[in-house]
């Protein structure tokens, strides 16, 4: 095992013990010892785009909300509209503070009007859980943080369904995009399986008790060995989500960045009644956005990185939220949060790389066309 020296104080997923077998390079991610890569970020990225990759995402948090008032409680807590959700459907949404900033972005799994599973970002588990408890008020709900009991694997890529199908009698083609099925037997283990992911490709996220994670990881890799399936780390997960224009909390979203500034207003439903942050977001919408998230492509050499300054007219207009050499597009591209008046597609900006202003042009931030099965 290569990478971080002081792993002792970090949290570990149930798969940590077998990382050395796969030559994982370990980093500290939000207090977790996680594989940034196995073979290489680029080869893992390409495997997901062309065949499939298997990710350990057991660091993600799971919080159950149940009880008579589960629906009205979540409808008030979250920006998206849960009234449109069918049983066994998944919803992407934000949990905002009273200023409209994002406490977290998350997935809601609806079992029924009085039972939901929320899947939250690893760095925000405790913060989210406290925020939910603090806002429970008069609602008759039970809120349980079950993150420590549940492991999660994600198989992503055009061959994901074909590979996973080898391990189950369940017809996976019947699980539609952003739907899930519980108690699906994968290699004999009862799992929750959803057609969701964070790569821009088709695929599944699989939730199971911790004690079955190692077995399932190895069984899935074995089933996919003739299909080009590779174990994939957080490095490829980040380049994949970035190409697909999907936000990362702490980069494109945060308590100081609203969903509207991030260009994700679609997931904020102003017509659904009251919710925390609504007034601030409505005011921002009516007054017009001062900042916008944009995509850009470097004209010259130079790879933009998170935090780099962006300039126009010889003044600072914002900063890079994420930047990479795109393995799929073979270009240096980035996302930046900048002054709205410079945010038109086609505008030239400059990114300060090693103290030099390098030219870039604003482009559509969905760099890669998503290949979801709908």
From Swiss-Prot:
Family, per entry: Belongs to the GcvT family.
* Originating species: Caldanaerobacter subterraneus subsp. tengcongensis (strain DSM 15242 / JCM 11007 / NBRC 100824 / MB4)
Q: Name the chain's protein.
A: Aminomethyltransferase
- Domain of life, per the record? Bacteria
Keywords linked to the UniProt accession? Aminotransferase, Transferase
State its role.
The glycine cleavage system catalyzes the degradation of glycine.
Query: A single GO molecular function, which one?
Result: transaminase activity
- EC number(s)? 2.1.2.10
List, alphabetically, the InterPro entries matched: GCS_T (IPR006223), GCS_T_bac (IPR022903), GCST_C (IPR013977), GCV_T_N (IPR006222), GcvT/YgfZ/DmdA (IPR028896), GcvT/YgfZ_C (IPR029043), TrmE/GcvT_dom1 (IPR027266)
Give the reaction(s) catalysed: N(6)-[(R)-S(8)-aminomethyldihydrolipoyl]-L-lysyl-[protein] + (6S)-5,6,7,8-tetrahydrofolate = N(6)-[(R)-dihydrolipoyl]-L-lysyl-[protein] + (6R)-5,10-methylene-5,6,7,8-tetrahydrofolate + NH4(+)
This protein's GO cellular component annotations are: cytosol; glycine cleavage complex
